[in-house]
UniProtKB/Swiss-Prot annotation:
E.C. numbers: 2.7.1.30
Keyword annotations: ATP-binding, Glycerol metabolism, Kinase, Nucleotide-binding, Transferase
UniProt-listed GO biological process terms: glycerol catabolic process; glycerol metabolic process; glycerol-3-phosphate metabolic process
Protein name: Glycerol kinase
Disulfide bonds: none
Gene coding for it: glpK
KW Nucleotide-binding (keyword) present: yes
GO CC field: cytosol
Lineage: Bacteria, Bacillati, Bacillota, Clostridia, Lachnospirales
Positions annotated to bind ATP: 12-14, 265, 308, 312, 409
Length: 499
């Protein structure tokens, strides 16, 4: 039997396992959802044992589906929801509290205080991040400050912190290994991305004991072995990366200026910037990209809060479509939006505007406005928001975009991808294998063991599924983008206190 790479893909709503062969083809998939916990409005938690039990069960299931044994698995690569925070007892393995999920904003007041203290510039300079409750630092502090006896136990050295990758590796190795990779460390708001170390000044500010923190190493390197009894024998763990960085690697965006966009609930855009950590002047995050061969690479990251969620809104709240795929059919029934723009700022606007108080708007409505126009305008809004982030990336990097690689659920929408190419005036490439996040984790693991020879071999595996070339004339493109800017101004104006 040929050997496989096992990718453990631990997401926000489910745990998945995919077995890949040397050609980067999917050989087996297993998936299991787990319970979301909402203790209060705006709070989001996961039970750490649910994360672990679902992940190990799908690993066994994926192996069993094709009759694979431990000796048939070359190595394991892990990719995970980023920033989600777990604290546990290093002697018993028992979590002291539920995992606080990246979406949870219970610590927003800590961020406001941080800004009042003038500490936001320190965070920005050292971590590359714009201070936000999204990241791990304030979540750790909340657990230390609000769970009885936890701060004392942490200061005594008996507690450990980890992002989800760390928690999975710790359990796979039965507590022998407490480690993370550079990409996940770079999302904690505690890690100096320039000197590649946990930052003492930031730890002191948040009153977080350094003894809690994991060792940090390259995304493609040897992390340890699984405990023999878990999957029928020892398996090497040799890759780990946060989900968006794993997708950048899975899309083979290895050169500075190469960009991928994942069209999920929101959009996550990452641009490889090589060995240069660019400090954004346009509201983007500077982060560490997944690397191999012992060298560090950086990326610029921009987020669009609402993308696929806008299509869900058409389906669930507006009841204009019965399934997401119908949005393409309706959009193609009209030649344009009849001058209408939808700005889906349901939870504010992300990069490059960063206004949490902006609200969704529909502008330019006339009597001739139809359901089809509404659906088309909503789809087009995903492309316009992507243009805004990519233009910010071009300005920060001084690199002109040559093409965009796409993945995620909404990338299957051919109308959207063509419109994206048109308003961006750039080629859009969609790969045949859209499992780019798990594939990135598999590639990182396989490079560390020699299963994959080098990046060139991986590039050869990348197979084009579809190309979308710009077909819009320059004048029309400029007019549409000008209209979008006016529509965004309306969404931003809603946040202003106007008498």
């Amino acid at each position: 039997m040929e050997k496989y790479i096992m990718a453990l893909d631990q997401g926000t709503t489910s745990s998945r396992c995919i077995l890949f062969n040397q050609r980067g083809e999917v050989c087996s998939v297993a998936q299991k959802e787990f319970t979301q916990v909402y203790p209060r409005t705006g709070w989001v938690e996961h039970r750490p044992m649910d994360i672990w039990s679902s992940q190990i069960s799908v690993a066994a299931e994926a192996m069993a589906a094709i009759g694979a044994k431990a000796e048939d698995i070359d190595s394991i690569g892990i990719t995970n929801q980023r920033e989600t925070t777990i604290v546990w007892d290093k002697n018993t393995g028992e979590p002291v509290y539920n995992a606080i999920v990246w979406q949870c904003h219970r610590t927003a007041d800590m961020i406001e205080q941080l800004k009042k203290d003038g500490f936001d510039s320190v965070i920005r300079k050292k971590t590359g991040l714009i201070p936000d409750a999204y990241f791990s630092a304030t979540k750790i502090k909340w657990i230390l400050d609000n769970v009885d006896g936890v701060r004392e136990r942490a200061e005594a050295g008996s507690l450990l912190f980890g992002t989800v990758d760390t928690w999975i590796i710790w359990n796979l190795t039965k507590g022998r290994v407490h480690v993370t990779d550079y990409t996940n460390a770079s999302r904690t708001m505690l890690f100096d991305i320039h000197n590649l170390c946990w930052d003492d000044e930031i730890l002191t500010y948040f009153k977080i004991p350094k003894s809690m923190l994991p060792k940090v190493q390259a995304s493609s390197s040897i992390f340890g072995h699984t405990e023999e009894g878990l999957l029928g024998g020892e398996i090497l763990i040799s890759g780990a990366a946060g989900d968006q960085q794993a997708a950048l690697f899975g899309q083979c965006c290895f050169e500075p200026g190469e960009v991928k966009n994942t069209y999920g609930t929101g959009c996550f855009l990452l641009m490889n910037t090589g060995d240069t950590a660019i400090e954004s002047q346009n509201g983007l995050l500077t982060t560490i990209a997944a690397g191999d061969a012992g060298h560090i690479e950086y990326a610029l990251e921009g987020s669009v809060f609402v993308a696929g969620a806008a299509i869900q809104w058409l389906r669930d709240e507006q009841r204009m479509i019965k399934k997401a795929s119908q949005s393409e059919e309706y959009a193609k029934e009209v030649e344009d939006t009849n001058g209408v723009y939808v700005v889906p700022a349901f939870t504010g606007l992300g990069a490059p505007y960063w206004n949490p108080y902006a609200r969704g708007t529909i502008v330019g409505i006339t009597r001739g406005f139809s359901k089809e126009h509404m659906i088309r305008a909503t789809l087009e809004s995903l492309a316009y928001q992507t243009v805004n982030v990519l233009h910010a990336m071009e300005q920060d990097s001084n690199i002109s975009l040559k093409s965009l690689r796409v993945d995620g659920g909404a990338s299957a929408n051919n109308f959207l991808m063509q419109f994206q190419a048109d308003v961006l005036n750039t080629l859009v490439y969609r790969p045949q294998c859209i499992e780019t996040t798990a594939l990135g984790a598999a590639y990182l693991a396989g490079l560390a063991t020699g299963y994959f020879k080098d990046r060139n071999e991986i590039k050869d595996n990348w197979t084009l599924g579809g190309t979308f070339s710009p077909q819009m004339d320059e004048q029309k493109r400029k007019e549409l983008l000008k209209g979008w800017k006016r529509a965004v101004r309306c969404a931003l104006a809603w946040a202003e206190d106007i008498e």
